[in-house]
């Protein structure tokens, strides 16, 4: 029992009656003898313990609690620290539809740094070299005709994990399968007019930047926001 007045209320119930009163007048719920609470509590023992005093589980728990908490995943840490470059190209349909600013804005909001930008009419030879891995495909001639049908905007972007992140921002090749929120998912409806190109690997990022930009056309600069994007 717990309470400020529990002792005063308990005592008259459980003490022996005065000598002049007979046993019939005793409270039927109490014994005439005084109750020794310390003895009663000492007699109580828990039926089980989660860990014995020196069990292996207890020692492991103590060791883990004293160690610094944290998870170290070196492969994730390494990927998070790699500053990469990727090539992004707004295709002729993206320019005709006035989407250049929208596309640049999405990459800037993500925190990537623009280090190269130019607009020009793509010659056929350059388009064929860029898409040479697709030269055996039946749609290759139409692809080259499409890319050379109007000016393109060439961009080089820099950032931590920029290649994979840019691919996610762009969305799947088929706009109808691209997730809402991606460039293609929001702004395109057909594979043949999917607005933008992005490098599919860090190696291709370097190759494509070297293909579309001449020496001296890239601008290396320090962003004032860098400390707010990375620790």
Curated annotation (Swiss-Prot):
<dbReference type="GO" id="GO:0009579">
    <property type="term" value="C:thylakoid"/>
</dbReference>
<dbReference type="GO" id="GO:0006241">
    <property type="term" value="P:CTP biosynthetic process"/>
</dbReference>
<dbReference type="GO" id="GO:0009585">
    <property type="term" value="P:red, far-red light phototransduction"/>
</dbReference>
<keyword id="KW-0150">Chloroplast</keyword>
<dbReference type="GO" id="GO:0009570">
    <property type="term" value="C:chloroplast stroma"/>
</dbReference>
<keyword id="KW-0808">Transferase</keyword>
<keyword id="KW-0809">Transit peptide</keyword>
<dbReference type="Pfam" id="PF00334">
    <property type="entry name" value="NDK"/>
</dbReference>
<keyword id="KW-0547">Nucleotide-binding</keyword>
<dbReference type="GO" id="GO:0006228">
    <property type="term" value="P:UTP biosynthetic process"/>
</dbReference>
<keyword id="KW-0597">Phosphoprotein</keyword>
<dbReference type="GO" id="GO:0009507">
    <property type="term" value="C:chloroplast"/>
</dbReference>
<keyword id="KW-0418">Kinase</keyword>
<dbReference type="GO" id="GO:0005634">
    <property type="term" value="C:nucleus"/>
</dbReference>
<keyword id="KW-0067">ATP-binding</keyword>
<dbReference type="GO" id="GO:0009734">
    <property type="term" value="P:auxin-activated signaling pathway"/>
</dbReference>
<feature type="binding site">
    <location>
        <position position="184"/>
    </location>
    <ligand>
        <name>ATP</name>
    </ligand>
</feature>
<dbReference type="InterPro" id="IPR036850">
    <property type="entry name" value="NDK-like_dom_sf"/>
</dbReference>
<keyword id="KW-0546">Nucleotide metabolism</keyword>
<dbReference type="InterPro" id="IPR023005">
    <property type="entry name" value="Nucleoside_diP_kinase_AS"/>
</dbReference>
<feature type="active site" description="Pros-phosphohistidine intermediate">
    <location>
        <position position="197"/>
    </location>
</feature>
<feature type="binding site">
    <location>
        <position position="167"/>
    </location>
    <ligand>
        <name>ATP</name>
    </ligand>
</feature>
<protein>
    <recommendedName>
        <fullName>Nucleoside diphosphate kinase II, chloroplastic</fullName>
        <ecNumber>2.7.4.6</ecNumber>
    </recommendedName>
</protein>
<comment type="similarity">
    <text>Belongs to the NDK family.</text>
</comment>
<dbReference type="InterPro" id="IPR001564">
    <property type="entry name" value="Nucleoside_diP_kinase"/>
</dbReference>
<dbReference type="GO" id="GO:0046872">
    <property type="term" value="F:metal ion binding"/>
</dbReference>
<comment type="function">
    <text>Major role in the synthesis of nucleoside triphosphates other than ATP. The ATP gamma phosphate is transferred to the NDP beta phosphate via a ping-pong mechanism, using a phosphorylated active-site intermediate. May activate MPK3 and MPK6. May be involved in the regulation of cellular redox state and hydrogen peroxide-mediated MAP kinase signaling.</text>
</comment>
<feature type="transit peptide" description="Chloroplast">
    <location>
        <begin position="1"/>
        <end position="62"/>
    </location>
</feature>
<keyword id="KW-0460">Magnesium</keyword>
<keyword id="KW-0479">Metal-binding</keyword>
<dbReference type="GO" id="GO:0005524">
    <property type="term" value="F:ATP binding"/>
</dbReference>
<keyword id="KW-0934">Plastid</keyword>
<dbReference type="GO" id="GO:0009941">
    <property type="term" value="C:chloroplast envelope"/>
</dbReference>
<dbReference type="InterPro" id="IPR034907">
    <property type="entry name" value="NDK-like_dom"/>
</dbReference>
<dbReference type="GO" id="GO:0004550">
    <property type="term" value="F:nucleoside diphosphate kinase activity"/>
</dbReference>
<dbReference type="GO" id="GO:0042542">
    <property type="term" value="P:response to hydrogen peroxide"/>
</dbReference>
<feature type="binding site">
    <location>
        <position position="194"/>
    </location>
    <ligand>
        <name>ATP</name>
    </ligand>
</feature>
<dbReference type="GO" id="GO:0009536">
    <property type="term" value="C:plastid"/>
</dbReference>
<dbReference type="GO" id="GO:0005737">
    <property type="term" value="C:cytoplasm"/>
</dbReference>
<comment type="subunit">
    <text>Interacts with PHYA, MPK3 and MPK6.</text>
</comment>
<feature type="binding site">
    <location>
        <position position="173"/>
    </location>
    <ligand>
        <name>ATP</name>
    </ligand>
</feature>
<feature type="binding site">
    <location>
        <position position="91"/>
    </location>
    <ligand>
        <name>ATP</name>
    </ligand>
</feature>
